[in-house]
Amino acid sequence: MKASELQGKDQAALTKELNDLLKAQFGLRMQIATQQLNNTSQLKKVRRDIARVKTVMNQKDAK
């Protein structure tokens, strides 16, 4: 997901996206804990997507 895609969304859509990503991150962490996740780079991607969403949300709040 690119930041330019996120900047076109409104605050409600960004909040929903953030909640979805946080749920995905929790699921991936549980899979790592139970040793079911083979591709651990997925967690890194989700973590960075969360950071992107939060950054765009903060930028919109500052305006």
Swiss-Prot record:
One cellular component (GO) term of this entry: cytosolic large ribosomal subunit
InterPro entries membership: Ribosomal_protein_uL29, Ribosomal_uL29, Ribosomal_uL29_CS, Ribosomal_uL29_sf
Family, similarity comment: Belongs to the universal ribosomal protein uL29 family.
Originating species: Herminiimonas arsenicoxydans
A Gene Ontology molecular function term of the record: structural constituent of ribosome
Domain of life the protein comes from: Bacteria
Leader sequence segment: none
GO terms of biological process kind: translation
Keywords: Ribonucleoprotein, Ribosomal protein
Protein name (database record): Large ribosomal subunit protein uL29
